[in-house]
C-alpha cells in the first residue's frame, strides 16, 4: 500500500513537472500595436489563431496608443532594454526606424531562423516602401497598408437630390455637392482625417507632384520639401473657401472625422481605407466608397495613391527562440487565407498578391462594391519616382508642423500660401537636423 502511494505520488509529481516544463517552454512574444476599436479586435483574433496552432509560442498583443505614441514608447523601451519583440510603426516612421539602430531587419530574422521567406509574395508597390535600397531586402514586414478613400452617405445624397451611386470625382464637384448637402439639412458637408497625409502627401502624389526633392527622400537624406507649389496652394485655398462657407469642417489632426461620418453628422469624409471596419460596424445608413477626388484642371491626374498604415518591425536584442517565434508569426500573417481575411475585414490593402487574387476568386469585391477602391487607387498608374511613397527623416514631426500651419488657415490667421511656405521652411529645418544626426 505504502509503495503504491509513493508510486502514485511520484507519477503525480512527474506529470506536474512535465506540465510545468511545457508551460515554461512557451516563448512569449510581446507585440505592441496601435489598432483600436474593431481593428484591435481583429489583431487579437490573429494572435489567438496563431497561438492555438503554435504551442511553443504565445503572441501577446498590447495596444500602446496611436502611431506617434507607440513609436515613442517603442524607442524609449529599447533604450531601457525593455522593448517588445514586434513593434507596429506607421509608414512615416520608416526613416526613423532605419536610423534607430534598434531593429533587426526582417529578412535577417527569417534567415537566422532558417525559415524560407519569399519577399516576392508582397505587392511590389507596398513592399517597395519598406525595402532597403542598398540590399533590396525588406527591413520590416507590411501589415496594415492603406490609401485614403472617400466615404459618402448615400441616404444624404438622395435627400439632397444627388445620385447616390455617383460620388464626386473632382474636388470641384465635391465643393458643389457639399453645398447641396448642407442646404438639404446635413450639419457637416465634408470633413477629413489625417490632413497632412491626405490633403498634402496624397494630394501631391495623386496629381503627380513631388512632396520633396530626391524622389521624396528615397535617393538621400539631403532632400528638401516641395509641397508649396501652385497646385497644392490652389487645393488648400479651395478647402479654405469651403471652410468659410461652413461646407468643410475641421475636427482634428487624427481620424476624428470618421466618427463624425458614421454617426451621421458629416455626409462626406476622406479617411483611411482601414476606417472601413469601424464604418461598417457603426454606420446605420447606406454608405458608399469612392476614389479620392482630383483637381479637374490638373494635367494627367489622377496618378496613383501612396500608402499609409504601418508595418511590423522586429526589435534588436532578443534571444534565438524569440526570433524563431517572430518569424513563424510573420510567415503566418502572409498565408493567403489569413492575409485575405485581414484585408476583407479591415479595409486595409491586400499585402500579398495571393491575398488579392483569393479575394477576387471568392467574389468579395462583387458582393462588397467599393472594397477594392484602395487597391485600384494604388495601382491606378505605374508609380513615378516621386509617387511611390516618401522616406523623410523626422516625418512625424513634419506632419505636426503641417497640422499647425493648416490650422492657421482654417482659423483665418494665414493664407494657404503663407501656411505652406512656412510649413516647408520649418520642415526643412527638421530634415536638415535628421541628415546631420545620421551622417
Curated annotation (Swiss-Prot):
Compartment annotation: Periplasm
SUPFAM superfamilies registered for this protein in UniProt: Periplasmic binding protein-like II
BP terms from Gene Ontology: transmembrane transport
Sorted UniProt keywords: Periplasm, Signal, Transport
UniProt: sn-glycerol 3-phosphate binding residues: 67, 91, 146, 272, 309, 348, 399
GO cellular component: cell envelope; periplasmic space
Keyword flag Repressor: no
Subunit structure: The complex is composed of two ATP-binding proteins (UgpC), two transmembrane proteins (UgpA and UgpE) and a solute-binding protein (UgpB).
Descriptive protein name: sn-glycerol-3-phosphate-binding periplasmic protein UgpB
UniProt organism field: Yersinia enterocolitica serotype O:8 / biotype 1B (strain NCTC 13174 / 8081)
Amino acid at each position: 500500500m505504502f509503495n503504491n502511494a509513493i508510486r502514485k505520488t511520484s507519477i503525480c509529481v512527474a506529470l506536474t513537472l512535465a506540465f510545468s516544463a511545457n508551460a515554461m517552454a512557451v516563448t512569449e512574444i510581446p507585440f505592441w500595436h496601435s489598432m483600436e476599436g474593431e481593428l484591435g479586435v481583429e489583431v487579437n483574433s490573429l494572435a489567438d489563431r496563431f497561438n492555438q496552432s503554435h504551442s511553443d509560442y504565445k503572441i501577446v498583443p498590447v495596444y500602446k496608443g496611436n502611431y506617434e505614441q507607440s513609436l515613442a514608447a517603442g524607442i524609449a523601451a529599447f533604450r531601457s532594454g525593455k522593448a517588445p519583440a514586434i513593434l507596429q510603426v506607421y509608414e512615416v516612421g520608416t526613416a526613423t526606424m532605419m536610423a534607430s539602430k534598434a531593429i533587426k531587419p526582417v529578412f535577417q530574422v527569417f534567415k537566422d531562423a532558417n525559415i524560407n521567406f519569399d519577399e516576392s509574395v508582397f505587392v511590389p508597390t507596398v513592399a517597395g516602401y519598406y525595402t532597403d535600397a542598398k540590399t533590396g531586402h525588406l527591413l520590416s514586414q507590411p501589415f496594415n497598408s492603406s490609401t485614403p478613400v472617400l466615404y459618402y452617405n448615400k441616404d444624404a445624397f438622395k435627400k439632397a437630390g444627388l445620385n447616390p451611386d455617383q460620388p464626386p470625382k473632382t474636388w470641384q464637384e465635391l465643393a458643389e455637392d457639399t453645398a447641396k448637402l448642407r442646404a438639404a439639412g446635413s450639419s457637416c458637408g465634408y470633413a477629413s482625417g489625417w490632413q497632412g497625409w491626405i490633403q498634402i502627401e496624397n494630394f501631391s502624389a495623386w496629381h503627380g507632384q513631388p512632396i520633396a526633392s530626391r524622389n521624396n527622400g528615397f535617393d538621400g537624406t539631403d532632400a528638401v520639401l516641395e509641397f508649396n507649389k501652385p497646385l497644392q496652394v490652389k487645393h488648400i485655398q479651395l478647402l479654405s473657401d469651403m471652410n468659410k462657407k461652413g461646407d468643410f469642417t475641421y475636427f482634428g489632426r487624427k481620424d476624428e472625422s470618421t466618427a463624425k461620418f458614421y454617426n451621421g453628422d458629416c455626409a462626406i469624409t476622406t479617411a483611411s481605407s482601414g476606417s472601413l471596419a469601424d464604418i461598417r460596424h457603426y454606420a446605420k445608413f447606406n454608405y458608399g466608397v469612392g476614389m479620392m477626388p482630383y483637381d479637374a484642371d490638373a494635367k494627367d491626374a489622377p496618378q496613383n495613391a501612396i500608402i499609409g498604415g504601418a508595418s511590423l518591425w522586429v526589435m534588436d536584442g532578443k534571444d534565438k527562440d524569440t526570433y524563431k517565434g517572430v518569424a513563424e508569426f510573420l510567415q503566418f500573417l502572409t498565408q493567403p487565407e489569413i492575409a485575405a481575411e485581414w484585408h476583407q475585414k479591415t479595409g486595409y490593402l491586400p499585402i500579398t498578391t495571393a491575398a488579392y487574387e483569393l479575394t477576387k476568386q471568392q467574389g468579395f469585391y462583387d458582393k462588397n462594391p467599393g472594397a477594392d477602391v484602395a487597391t485600384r487607387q494604388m495601382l491606378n498608374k505605374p508609380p513615378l519616382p516621386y509617387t511611390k511613397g516618401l522616406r523623410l527623416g523626422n516625418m512625424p514631426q513634419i506632419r505636426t508642423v503641417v497640422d499647425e500651419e493648416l490650422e492657421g488657415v482654417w482659423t483665418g490667421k494665414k493664407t494657404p500660401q503663407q501656411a505652406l511656405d512656412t510649413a516647408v521652411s520649418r520642415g526643412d529645418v527638421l530634415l536638415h537636423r535628421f541628415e546631420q544626426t545620421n551622417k
